[in-house]
């Protein structure tokens, strides 16, 4: 087959694999990510005249070398490369299950090459963790009450980008001072405490939110300018923009230069560090972060909400003192 025919064959294989992955009830975001990765791999394999069915332990090293640099000429991070091969593993499992290949060589390959590759390629650069004063300056410098509330909620809860965007108005209780986060594969703890300061910013936003188009019909807590649920890239742009205004985000930095990038995940580091330095117990911190229990005994020793709220409020600092 020529290159075009190989590409067409690879893309058909991808579509069949995606149908199978959907049947496994994978998360929608996982399905989208797998689809993007596999279509990219389909093109790369087409360029080197290989179908997915041709892949074995002898030619996977060549594929690894081919994917290290993206279309923009940037060298991919070890995490990104591992992500590509994780997607490829899902497709190869499908081909093995349907007897289109004799065996799936990806697990053996990843153990031999990607573990050491990740260790060698790690940048060793810690993600940026702002000071209290820097977080305050970002919030103060944000131009809209919506964006100020976003920064405040991220800082006070440590929610991830996706988790914050999934929040609905009904998930916020300003009386009990808590937020109910949606259950995800990465989050166990659902009921999260917030302090008076975060409550004030949310109250201001909920008042201002009424003026947004579609506010009555859309249940999402944070809306975009069209009145729909805030998107991933829009949220990232807000955080990047406001961090950049305070000199905390370099838009020209490489994605691996974590110390020069101000992203939603920065707040997760800030919250964890702040609570720990203020004496909050590790178990409460794990609960707020949504981490799994530390031991099997933790499943029987129930962590009471009153304990979570008390320790959290004692450890969480006031960022913007009232005049």
Enumerate the predicted regions with their spans:
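C-terminal secondary-structure termini that scaffold catalytic or DNA-interacting sites
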Residues: 1-4, 314-323
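N-terminal core-binding DNA-recognition domain of tyrosine recombinases/integrases
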Residues: 15-29, 35-120
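Flexible interdomain linker/hinge and immediately adjacent N-terminus
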Residues: 97-137, 182-185, 225-228
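C-terminal catalytic core of tyrosine-transesterase DNA break-rejoin enzymes
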Residues: 152, 156, 265-292
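Short, polar N-cap/turn motifs at the start of nucleic acid-interacting alpha helices
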Residues: 172-174, 260, 280-301, 323
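Catalytic-site neighborhood detector that most strongly recognizes the C-terminal catalytic loop/helix
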Residues: 183, 289-315
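C-terminal catalytic core of Y-nucleophile DNA break-rejoin enzymes
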Residues: 184-204, 217-241, 263
């Amino acid at each position: 087959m020529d290159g075009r025919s190989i590409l067409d064959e690879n893309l058909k294989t991808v579509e069949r694999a995606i149908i199978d992955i959907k049947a496994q009830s994978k998360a929608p975001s996982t399905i989208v990510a797998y689809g993007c990765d596999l279509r990219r791999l389909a093109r790369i394999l087409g360029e080197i005249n290989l179908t997915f069915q041709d892949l074995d332990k002898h030619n996977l090293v060549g594929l690894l070398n081919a994917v290290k640099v993206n279309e923009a000429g940037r060298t991919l991070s070890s995490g990104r490369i591992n992500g590509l091969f994780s997607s490829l593993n899902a497709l190869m499992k499908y081909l093995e299950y349907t007897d289109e290949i004799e065996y799936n060589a990806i697990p053996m390959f990843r153990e031999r090459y990607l573990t050491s590759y990740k260790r060698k390629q790690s940048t060793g650069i810690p993600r940026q963790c702002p000071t209290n004063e820097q977080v305050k300056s970002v919030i103060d410098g944000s131009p809209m009450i919506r964006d100020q509330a976003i920064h405040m909620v991220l800082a006070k809860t440590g929610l991830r980008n996706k988790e914050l965007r999934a929040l609905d108005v009904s998930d916020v209780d300003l009386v009990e001072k808590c937020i109910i986060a949606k259950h995800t594969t990465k989050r166990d703890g659902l009921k999260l405490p917030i302090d008076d300061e975060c409550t004030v910013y949310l109250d201001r936003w909920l008042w201002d939110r009424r003026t947004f188009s579609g506010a009555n019909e859309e249940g999402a807590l944070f809306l975009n300018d069209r009145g729909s649920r805030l998107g991933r890239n829009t949220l990232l742009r807000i955080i990047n923009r406001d961090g950049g205004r305070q000199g905390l985000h370099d838009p020209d930095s490489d994605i691996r230069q974590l110390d020069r990038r101000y992203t939603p995940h920065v707040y997760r580091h800030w919250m964890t560090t702040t609570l720990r330095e203020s004496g909050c117990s590790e178990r409460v911190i794990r609960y707020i972060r949504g981490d799994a229990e530390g031991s099997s005994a933790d499943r029987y020793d129930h962590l009471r909400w009153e304990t979570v709220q008390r320790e959290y409020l004692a450890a969480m600092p006031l960022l913007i003192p009232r005049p």
